[in-house]
Curated annotation (Swiss-Prot):
InterPro entries: ApaH, Calcineurin-like_PHP_ApaH, Metallo-depent_PP-like
Documented EC number(s): 3.6.1.41
Gene Ontology MF terms: bis(5'-nucleosyl)-tetraphosphatase (symmetrical) activity
Organism taxonomic ancestry: Bacteria, Pseudomonadati, Pseudomonadota, Gammaproteobacteria, Vibrionales
Function statement: Hydrolyzes diadenosine 5',5'''-P1,P4-tetraphosphate to yield ADP.
Cysteine pairings via disulfide bonds: none
Cross-referenced Pfam families: Metallophos
Top enzyme category: hydrolase
UniProt keyword list: Hydrolase
Family affiliation: Belongs to the Ap4A hydrolase family.
Record keyword Hydrolase present: yes
Top-rank taxon: Bacteria
Organism (species): Aliivibrio salmonicida (strain LFI1238)
Catalytic activity: P(1),P(4)-bis(5'-adenosyl) tetraphosphate + H2O = 2 ADP + 2 H(+)
Protein name: Bis(5'-nucleosyl)-tetraphosphatase, symmetrical
Amino acid sequence: MATYFVGDIQGCLDELLLLLDQVSFDKEKDQLWLTGDLVARGPKSLETLRFVKSLDKAAVTILGNHDLHLLAVSQGISRIKEKDKTASIFTAPDSEELLTWLRHQPLLATHAQHNIVMTHAGISPQWNIETATECAREIESVLVSDKWVWLLENMYENQPDLWQSDLTGINRYRYIINAFTRMRFCYPDGRLDMECKQPPQELSSDDKEKLIPWFDLKSRCPLSHTVIFGHWAALMGYENNGVIALDTGCVWGEYMTMYRVDDGQYFTQKAIS
């Protein structure tokens, strides 16, 4: 049995299938862990949802910002973004089944054997693994309750940007969602920056003083697990300091990256979509 982690798919199903062919993936004995954002700008978002769902227990996926946006669009809360290719999902005969399945996916998944946690964007620098897990479970419980539409209606804001354990209600939920699905840079005091998407090396000298990748923040809570995440395509992959970034911009014409945790080997597939 082998365990593979793969970066954001975003509807680039053909590249994912080629990666799985590279390693002779067998869903009867192997596992595929996906860092979220199954859908969005690639050509096969509908087919990607169907494929990952069909893997059943051979796949573990988590929610990314594009997945949550898809759910919001399904309820008329938001509109399909100009470059997204997700319209076919809403007219598919299995649309409701797929969207319900997606809504029941977690924000954080733990691989106990390999001491790994997987989230879409990372772990808030104020959280240890226990707090992160508790926060993820809070949001997951709302998403499967009758308050899930209310949650999606109120998630589209950047505040609060600093974690406090006494946050309550939608402010608490919004921070948790932003940290798990949108975070890239933080300010030195730990506040989340929700605007900058550049790679760290391209920041101006002034910005480098005030914008720090969440995983490089000196005051970051020590973590007991390796963190595997996607989301930040501009990093073009990263492994250091107890974190592994796997989104390498396939949907932007770069390539898709998969990591076999058992032996630390990486596999890549150039974008063809």
